[in-house]
Amino acid sequence: YVLSWLGKGNHMSERITFHTDLIGLMAYPIRPPSSPAMQNEAFAKLGYDYAYLAFEVDANEIEAGVQALRTLKMRGANISMPNKTLVGKYLDELTPAAQMCGAVNTVVNDNGHLTGTITDGVGFMRAAADNGISPIGKKMTIVGCGGAGTAIQIQAALDGVSEISIFNRKDDFYHRGEETVQKINSQTSCKATLYDLADLQKLKEEMDDSYLFVNATGVGMKPLEGQSVVPDKSYFRPELNVVDIIYAPRLTKLREMAKEAGCKTMNGLGMMLFQGSAAFELWTGEPMPI
């Protein structure tokens, strides 16, 4: 239902009242997201007197932004760059996933008590399940230790994935990967290991032993369109499920090779949709009418 309304607007002027509760996106700069259209149409469909608006809030203003949540008695907010790793210290409570990720993308205001969570990993796991991919109790291999990759790794471990092999170049994010591995191994029953992406033989070995492979890097989208973190299709086998969290282009070089090898594949569009629907549930207590 919501998908049919993305980008069309939703006649908000017809439903704003004196009692309308506010939910916001706090980011800088604001880039045209689908979030306002998607959330507002879902609120209208289920009869919630909520309005979702975007606000430019930079890193120097996020503390004031959180105070505005309290002062204006907003129901909550989505938090995007550059504020995801900064906002947590101004909140009253963080969920385990947010604590482990060191990042927040959703805030819920319950009568002045602000709870921060991160729904990126939840969105990934729900999108995978929606596509018939269930890594619970199984092994996955993932490339990328940025924000999205970390959220996926943490949520997968919390949800019960048995083993995660993480690959990243030895850049600034490699240290973040080391921290994530330590947290997963000490706080969950999942076994996590970090490897250098330059070791392509090890990458193939881990992929050969995995149920799921995930690309959580930007390799495959502009300006790296047509490139892949996996060198060729010999790394894939039909039993391997492959997810590339990139959704523009819809079909990346990675997924093209995986499809040729007979793999079930998925792009990142579902992850984006389901992370938004997870936030909607936190604010309303009801599933989003997707």
Regions found by a protein language model. Give the residues of each.
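Glycine-rich adenosine-cofactor-binding loop
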Residues: 27, 118, 137-157
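Phosphate/diphosphate ligand-binding glycine-rich loop within oxidoreductases
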Residues: 15-131
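Active-site capping/gating segments
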Residues: 126, 247-248, 264-287
